[in-house]
């Protein structure tokens, strides 16, 4: 892992060759990763993880039939790998919150009641956590809270993945309840198709 100086700001940069896919698979081998939301980031992240051999399921509200049908068209199978949001959360050890900020607030009570000690809550941006006094999204103390933020749309993430390339992503650990949050975070970053993480 390299430390790089960007205009006086030191950043740790993790390359795929330093944290290869085989290591990511070892770190996440016992995890069930639920991607919540099949809108902007959900398709790219979930399909990349699926293609990389991870145990991933999708949680999508049937009320948003366009997204539900898109998930089915992309090969997710209702009752097997495609569930309503609550059932996906019940089955998961890692919950990726890839819905909109407004939806974070709406579904948070359902997500929170399904979190188990040792689970990980994953975001692709930090608004809901940073402004928790406004969003009321306050995770329990016994879970990991992590972020991997691809520097591009879910479409770009998927396109680059299919071309054998990655997209740069930022990563952060907000809460480490298990002692494994950082390793899980980097592994998920590699799993979704990041070229390198910083």
Language-model segment annotations:
Residues 31-49:
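Glycine-rich adenosine-cofactor-binding loop
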Residues 32, 54-57, 144:
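Residues at the starts of beta-strands that form the adenosine-phosphate
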Residues 44, 50-76:
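NAD(P)-binding Rossmann-fold cofactor-contacting core
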Residues 53, 103, 111, 115, ...:
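Structural signal for hydrophobic packing residues in well-ordered secondary-structure cores
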Residues 56, 78-81, 196:
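Hydrophobic beta-strand scaffold residues
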Residues 63, 74-130, 138-153:
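Rossmann-like NAD(P)-binding element
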Residues 123-198:
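Rossmann-fold dinucleotide-binding core
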């Amino acid at each position: 892992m390299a430390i790089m100086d960007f205009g006086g700001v030191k950043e740790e940069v993790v390359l795929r060759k330093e944290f290869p896919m085989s290591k990511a698979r070892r770190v996440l081998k016992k995890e069930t990763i639920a991607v919540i939301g099949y809108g902007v980031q959900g398709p790219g992240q979930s399909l990349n993880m699926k293609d990389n051999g991870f145990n991933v399921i999708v949680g999508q509200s049937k009320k948003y039939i366009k997204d539900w049908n898109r998930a089915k068209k992309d090969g997710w199978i209702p009752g097997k790998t495609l569930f309503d949001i609550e059932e996906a959360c019940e089955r998961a050890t890692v919950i990726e919150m890839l819905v909109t900020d407004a939806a974070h607030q709406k579904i948070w009570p359902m997500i929170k009641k399904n979190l188990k000690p040792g689970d990980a809550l994953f975001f692709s941006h930090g608004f809901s956590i940073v402004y928790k006094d406004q969003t009321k999204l306050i995770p329990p103390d016994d879970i990991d809270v992590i972020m991997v933020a691809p520097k591009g749309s879910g479409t770009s993430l998927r396109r680059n993945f299919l071309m054998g390339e990655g997209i740069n992503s930022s990563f952060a650990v907000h809460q480490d309840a298990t002692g494994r949050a950082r390793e899980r975070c980097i592994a998920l970053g590699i799993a979704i198709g990041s070229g390198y993480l910083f």
